[in-house]
Amino acid sequence: MQMHASTGCVLMASGLSTRFGSNKLLAPFDGQPLLYRAFAATDTPQLSARIVVTRSAQVQALCKAQGVPVLLHALPGRNDTVRLGLSALLAQHPELTGCMFLPGDQPLLRRATVDQLLTAFAQTQKETERVIFRLGAPAGNGPDPLVGSPVLFSNGFFPELFTLPEGKGGSVLLHKYPTLVHTACIAQPEELADTDTPAALAQLEALVREKG
């Protein structure tokens, strides 16, 4: 049983942005590079540490300019990004009881939502060492919520996160252990939206401006 939660965060920034046409994390969003939104969302004292894992030297330079820890690599798989990020965090913080994985392209995700997820995790982990948390939001009139990232794994899953199948991410474990997955529900489904295309980015940017 864990006495308290010490959680790290891996910012997933290794994608090739093939549908976007260029590195979307560097694309302007509301006057700043898109990745800055992930920096803001994870700038919380509830996280013990965070690191950006990327294959882009430009992203690396951006992180260094903002004082955000970054790991540059050249490996192809999503499993590589997970393994490298978690390993880097544990090298500096071996006491971590959980790790959150967040894609860098969810610009409407708020820090308050990240804090909500971290708080729910900390409360649940007092009772069990094997738990997975993800975000969920209302899906229109359907009975089942939309679900998405970030996803937070307790340290009981770290060994399996280090040995994920080639090219696969942590979602493998959500399918493997459905009874251990908890969903932290939020009111705004747009916080789960990503920006795979320039059109999607423009739509989310318009929503930000509309809300002021």
State where each predicted segment sits.
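Conserved alpha/beta core of the MobA/IspD/sugar-nucleotide pyrophosphorylase nucleotidyltransferase superfamily
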Residues: Q2-A5, P159, P165-G212
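N-terminal glycine-rich phosphate-binding loop and ensuing alpha1 helix
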Residues: Q2-A57
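Short beta-strand segments
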Residues: M12-S14, V53, L102-P103, R134-P138, ...
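A short acidic, helix-capping loop that chelates divalent metal ions and anchors anionic groups
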Residues: T18-S22, G142-P143, L192
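Short aromatic/basic micro-patch
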Residues: P28, L108, V151-L152, T183, ...
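Conserved N-terminal catalytic core of the sugar/cofactor nucleotidyltransferase
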Residues: Y36-M100, A112
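Conserved beta-loop-beta/alpha segment of the NTase-like Rossmann-fold superfamily
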Residues: L75-N155, P159-F162
